[in-house]
C-alpha cells in the first residue's frame, strides 16, 4: 500500500521563468519532504528485504501513509500560494519590460521558421500541403508584379536634354471611366439670318426658308436707303469711299436676289407649261431649259417689267458692257482707229499680243 501511494502522489511542474519568485521556506519544505520520502522508501525496501510481515510493520506503513497524505495537502496549498505570487508579480511588470522580452524572442514568423528548422534537424519532415504551394506561388507572382511596376516607373521618368528643349510626355493616357449615357441638350446659340448659310446659299433657299425670311429683303432695302442718305450728308472723302463701296455691294446683293427670284419664276412657268402640253398629248417627253436659255428668258422678263425710259437706259448700259467685252477679246491691231500707230488710242486696256 505504501509503494502505490508514493507512485500515485500528485506532483506539479513549476515554470522555469518563476524560479526566483519562490521563497526559501518553500524550498526548505520541499527538501524536507524529499528526505522523508527517501527515508520511507528505504524503510519499505528494508522491510521487503527482510520479509517480515508483522503487525508492527503494517502499523508503521499505515502511519506513513497518513503522513504522506498530509504532506500532499500541504504541497497543494504551497503550489496555490506560489501561483498567487506569480500572478501578482506578472501584474506588476511594466509594458517596457514585456516589449523588450518580445523583441529578444523575435517575430512570430522567425520563431515558426526556427521551430520548423529544428524539426527538420531532428529528422521530422513536415508534410507539404497544397495550400502552402498556392501561397508560395501567389507570393512569387506578387514579387514579380512589384518588380515589373518598379521597372515601368523607372522607364516612365522622362528628362529633358536641356532647359530649352521641349518636355517629353507620354502619349498614353488612361481611358476615362465616365460615360455619357444621356447627352445634355445643346445650348441655344443666337444667329443672324443675314449671315446664315442656310439662308444665303442658293441650295438652302427653299420655299419654306424664303417665306420665313422674306422680311430680310425689306431690311436690306431700308439699309441701302440709309447708306445713300449718309453718303449725301458726309463730307469726309474716306467715309464717302467706304459708303460707296457698301452701297455697291448692297445693290449687287439685291440685284442677285432679284435675278434668282426671276429665274425661279421663269422655271416654274416653263415646268407648268410643259406639264400641260404632256397632259394634252402634244408632247411625250418634257423639254428642260438650259442655263443660257433660262438667263435669256429671265432678262426678257426683266425688260418687260421696266418702263420705257428705264428700258432704254438698261439697253444702253448693256450695249456698252458687251462692246467693252468684245474689245478685250479683239486683237491689238484692230482696236485702233484708221492708221494710228498707238495701240491704246481708245483709252481702254487690253491684252498684249506677242510678236512672232
UniProtKB/Swiss-Prot annotation:
TM regions (residue ranges): none
Name of the protein: rRNA biogenesis protein rrp36
Biased composition annotated in UniProt, kind: Polar residues: 200-209
Keywords, comma-separated and alphabetical: Coiled coil, Nucleus, Ribonucleoprotein, Ribosome biogenesis, rRNA processing
Quaternary state and interactors: Associates with 90S and pre-40S pre-ribosomal particles.
Coiled coil: 238-280
Alphabetical GO biological process terms: maturation of SSU-rRNA from tricistronic rRNA transcript (SSU-rRNA, 5.8S rRNA, LSU-rRNA)
Function: Component of the 90S pre-ribosome involved in the maturation of rRNAs. Required for early cleavages of the pre-RNAs in the 40S ribosomal subunit maturation pathway.
Biased composition (Basic and acidic residues): 132-159, 313-337
Record InterPro entries: RRP36
PANTHER family: RIBOSOMAL RNA PROCESSING PROTEIN 36 HOMOLOG (PTHR21738:SF0)
Family in the record: Belongs to the RRP36 family.
Region: Disordered, residue numbers: 14-209, 305-356
